[in-house]
Amino acid sequence: MQNRNTFSWVKEQMTRSIFVSMMIYIITRASISNAYPIFAQQGYENPREATGRIVCANCHLANKPVDIEVPQAVLPDTVFEAVVRIPYDMQLKQVLANGKKGGLNVGAVLILPDGFELAPPDRISPAMKEKIGNLSFQSYRPTKKNILVIGPVPGQKYNEILFPILSPDPATKKEVHFLKYPIYVGGNRGRGQIYPDGSKSNNTVYNASASGIISRIIRKEKGGYEITIANALDGRQVVDIIPPGPELLVSEGESIKLDQPLTSNPNVGGFGQGDAEIVLQDPLRIQGLFLFLASVILAQIFLVLKKKQFEKVQLAEMNF
């Protein structure tokens, strides 16, 4: 009886352990594959360095264009559109983590002035919601609501990303003023070449770690290669591991030099950054401008009427 209870307890513990392990695996894979911006969020307090460089460029090495469009000026406590465009050739396919080819994902980081933030859902118009689609934005940090990140999302559908932004009101936020402010943006298409820990992804070129003769190339079952390089002087052998994805450029018996490319560069994506300016406009200034324009128009009208009156007087004197 005791042996049966022991067996049941062991069976229950094993089942529970397997279930917990599976859940951890699923959650971990989901968080890694669906949260590329988290790499920057975990490693950097601020995504924009003192030099002006956005840290995403540390992992996405190729330079590509990005564009941002915002209104020239906005009023306080107003929702407006910030449109980020990440252009690329839609026919391109990138190397995925498993070595296969697939479509490119895109992502973006938007660095707004202090006080500007993501518009709450109840302030977004139905027309703007339709433009946004199913995109989900998040703050870079809970304390940095002015820095927004998005991605990775399918580039075929979202190479143009609309951020709904709420402008601050200086009447309620004393640290905000009616001024011209800069806005910074970074956008990438495709996977990066380097992981945050400094290791290479399979979406980059692999170089020889030593000079010598390639004595053996082994193709792995799951893809990728093991390349053995023998030093011609001392016979010392070095093995370079190539993950699935990059295409091999060398063959057995070939003489190579240190840092010579062993593979092609499969990367078709890249990162770009840009900036724009926006004016937080004081409504009183606009009212003052309208009053000034109205006074100018009235002055012109009175001037024309006065001129006509003067011409009539002159004409009457001439007839007299």
Swiss-Prot record:
Keywords: Chloroplast, Electron transport, Heme, Iron, Membrane, Metal-binding, Photosynthesis, Plastid, Signal, Thylakoid, Transmembrane, Transmembrane helix, Transport
Protein name as catalogued: Cytochrome f
Ranges in coiled-coil conformation: none
GO cellular component: a single term: chloroplast thylakoid membrane
Gene Ontology MF terms: electron transfer activity; heme binding; iron ion binding
Residues in the signal sequence: 1-35
Bilayer topology annotation: Single-pass membrane protein
Subunit-structure text: The 4 large subunits of the cytochrome b6-f complex are cytochrome b6, subunit IV (17 kDa polypeptide, petD), cytochrome f and the Rieske protein, while the 4 small subunits are PetG, PetL, PetM and PetN. The complex functions as a dimer.
Subcellular location: Plastid, Chloroplast thylakoid membrane
Matching InterPro entries: Cyt-f_TM, Cyt_f, Cyt_f_lg_dom, Cyt_f_lg_dom_sf, Rudment_hybrid_motif
Main location: plastid
Cofactor note text: Binds 1 heme group covalently.
Protein family membership: Belongs to the cytochrome f family.
GO biological process: photosynthesis
Function: Component of the cytochrome b6-f complex, which mediates electron transfer between photosystem II (PSII) and photosystem I (PSI), cyclic electron flow around PSI, and state transitions.
Chain residues that bind heme: Y36, C56, C59, H60
Regions that span the bilayer: 286-306
Swiss-Prot/TrEMBL cofactor(s): heme
